[in-house]
């Protein structure tokens, strides 16, 4: 259901936005961890895709740039786990 944001006070709007951003970051970390495990298991290739990139574009319907950024972030965080905490 779509919320009428014009009904929110300034403070409510700011608080709501901050909450959404926190949730979004949490989901991003979870998404990257899932991609990391998929990459480790080579599940995209096992599922018939030439690469994790192709899986992300075709199956997850990410734009090419989004797929590339997420895969790069996933692989960097796999090498340097501290990156997850920075997100």
Give residue ranges: language-model regions.
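Amphipathic alpha-helical "recognition" segments
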Residues: 49-87
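N-terminal acidic-hydrophobic amphipathic loop/helix motif that frequently occurs adjacent to catalytic
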Residues: 1-60
């Amino acid at each position: 259901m779509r919320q009428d944001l014009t009904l929110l006070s300034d403070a409510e709007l700011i608080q709501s936005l901050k909450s959404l951003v926190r949730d979004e970051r949490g989901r991003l970390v979870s998404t990257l961890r899932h991609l990391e495990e998929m990459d480790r298991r080579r599940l995209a290739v096992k599922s018939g895709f030439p690469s994790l990139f192709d899986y992300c574009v075709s199956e997850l319907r990410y734009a090419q740039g989004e797929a590339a950024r997420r895969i790069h972030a996933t692989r960097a965080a796999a090498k340097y786990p501290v990156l997850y905490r920075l997100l």
